[in-house]
Amino acid sequence: MINNNMMNSQYMFDYPAINIDVRCHRLLSSVSYVAYNKFHTHDVSTYEHCEIPLEKLRLGFGRRNSLADFYSLGELPASWGPACYFSSVKPMMYTFQGMASDLSRFDLTSFSRKGLPNVLKALSWPLGIPDCEIFSICSDRFVRGLQTRDQLMSYILRMGDSHSLDECIVQAHKKILQEARRLGLSDEHYNGYDLFREIGSLVCLRLINAEPFDTASSGEALDVRTVIRSYRASDPSTGLTEYGNSLWTPIHSHVDENDESSSDSDF
């Protein structure tokens, strides 16, 4: 006899165990995939090797231009992203990926040097406090697979405010679109195909907009500024689709003239 409960379920190999910690903007929250190997009561969506039980949304089929085309109807794709042979969301190329990879060699201490308050502010999106993990995820050296599922879904979990991963994915993409629009960019370039590279692209653009307002001119802080500056357009008006509106509300840096980070150069 067929179990009627299985008619509306899907086999799941590994289940995402969620630990919510509300301290530090949920930055201590985490996802750990554990062996499951049985039918789950919900349908399952797959993104970047990560199985996601659909607790809040339904399973959507077919290929659409954007992730929003699914969740606007209360759905998530059956599978999508760069790891898919045939993604349900249209593949997309992203800007500033070389910059993200170049910045992956710095840790948060490097970005926290004196004279870099605007750079640090730029890194405070999307998690609410400075974080540079996205550069490692977007690095050329980062290979997504079963071994990276916990890290990737933990990042998505921290971007949202839900206990359900499917809902956190929707919240993450909505946050991406909101920031892209704020920076004068088009939704079509941030369609949810690769959430992490979209986040990396936007963080890089925030850094490009923020860096001119900082004053650090020596040591590791100067190295950070040099990398960022190397990706700034000489004439941003010629690359509006990439550089947006250059919007930034600066934090004015007050550096002591005897401090090693104080500037007496034209950098």
From Swiss-Prot:
Similarity field: Belongs to the phlebovirus NS-S protein family.
Domain of life: Viruses
Pfam families: NSs
Disulphide linkage map: none
UniProt name for this protein: Non-structural protein NS-S
Primary gene name: NSS
Signal sequence segment: none
